[in-house]
């Protein structure tokens, strides 16, 4: 499971010209799900995200978690994160989990974050979306359960 995290001042998702989801200060997560991923990956990643100290304290040191700052999380499915660009010039998505199975783990990830007391918004699984964000920093991390 691959998560690209961006610390944001705000983020929103638009589908079909309509804003369907938005957050203020928090973390925007693009989530890619690999064929080898399982519930174990979901729990590991959710725990890591919730406890990762990527927000600055009063001394401008990254020392605060999303819980500490009372922030929100937006999760957007992003199967291209499971893409492989090593061979040729066209990405291969053979490692990406089929959408029917991936959606369950996507939902499990969102549910796990919510169970930890974090407000979570989401994109629309398997939809073409316009994602807007205002980075804070910028601060970007890639978390991989492999």
From Swiss-Prot:
One of its GO terms (molecular function) is tRNA binding. GO terms for cellular component: cytoplasm. Its EC number is 3.1.1.96. It is an enzyme of class 3 (hydrolase). An aminoacyl-tRNA editing enzyme that deacylates mischarged D-aminoacyl-tRNAs. Also deacylates mischarged glycyl-tRNA(Ala), protecting cells against glycine mischarging by AlaRS. Acts via tRNA-based rather than protein-based catalysis; rejects L-amino acids rather than detecting D-amino acids in the active site. By recycling D-aminoacyl-tRNA to D-amino acids and free tRNA molecules, this enzyme counteracts the toxicity associated with the formation of D-aminoacyl-tRNA entities in vivo and helps enforce protein L-homochirality. Belongs to the DTD family. This is D-aminoacyl-tRNA deacylase. It comes from Thermodesulfovibrio yellowstonii (strain ATCC 51303 / DSM 11347 / YP87). The gene is dtd.
